[in-house]
């Protein structure tokens, strides 16, 4: 790819995201989503590998279908109510269509099948964008229409996402697929609280973005695409590997790390809304995700593989430390003491 193309594509991503999150009109929001889709496709397929081209094709087809559904939903609502305002989504059919469209864009169960495959075919930093930045505009549309959405439908999709995200990640050895199923599982936590506390859903997404970005950047630095490469990278980056373990445990939601905060607040809010069974169910389902986080964390800290590995050991080289990785790693581990202040704001 031409080196001048990447900044243009990144600026287009920023433009598309800004248009969608700042618009009140459905057509403008749809335009922003389309700009985002067209800007990310060259970044997915830039390696010219057949798997990358396949991933870009799958991404384009699913996002095109979802965008068409968004447009159809808004047109149906405008036909019935005369309103193009995003917050005035009052027609029941439009609400159902929009929920399906955004679920496809986010990768919520049962529309999750494309997401792990696309992430597996993308470079690590593009996978980071797909897991974080690309989810922000559709999530913003859900937040703006949260008062019109069906709580029972979202709760069902959320519990299914938490279950399948944990269950399907159990047998994975590719780091990108593990993080894809981790993303699906976290989206379940966001979706279950979205109708009852939109601010808390947004906070959960922000913290998820910080933690996932830190993990992706750490994996990119040690060039770990699968568990075997994580297993043999301790000789090259011993400190980063130890930090990676803490970041993964934070992503799993273990106290006293940052990831515990959103889960704690969500369970508390669900209990206040008299949804104790749903809170118990999603808390139990998060144990599935905990298993594969623990397995990856164990691989990142082990200093002697239990059997001979096919990968050569990577020896230490004195490269300058990455400041963004260090900042994100610190935030993804140490934010739990701010919980009282965050709870007061939410």
Curated annotation (Swiss-Prot):
It is found in: Mitochondrion inner membrane. It is an enzyme of class 7 (translocase). GO terms for molecular function: NADH dehydrogenase (ubiquinone) activity. The keyword Transmembrane helix applies. Keywords: Electron transport, Membrane, Mitochondrion, Mitochondrion inner membrane, NAD, Respiratory chain, Translocase, Transmembrane, Transmembrane helix, Transport, Ubiquinone. One of its GO terms (cellular component) is mitochondrial inner membrane. The chain crosses the membrane at residues 1-21, 25-45, 60-80, 95-115, 124-144, 149-169, 178-195, 200-219, 242-262, 274-294, 326-346. It holds the Pfam family NADH_dehy_S2_C. It is a multi-pass membrane protein. One of its GO terms (biological process) is mitochondrial electron transport, NADH to ubiquinone. InterPro entries: Complex_I_Subunit_2, NADH_DH_su2_C, NADH_UbQ_OxRdtase_chain2, ND/Mrp_TM. Belongs to the complex I subunit 2 family. Core subunit of the mitochondrial membrane respiratory chain NADH dehydrogenase (Complex I) that is believed to belong to the minimal assembly required for catalysis. Complex I functions in the transfer of electrons from NADH to the respiratory chain. The immediate electron acceptor for the enzyme is believed to be ubiquinone. This is NADH-ubiquinone oxidoreductase chain 2. The lineage of its organism: Eukaryota, Metazoa, Chordata, Craniata, Vertebrata. The gene is MT-ND2.
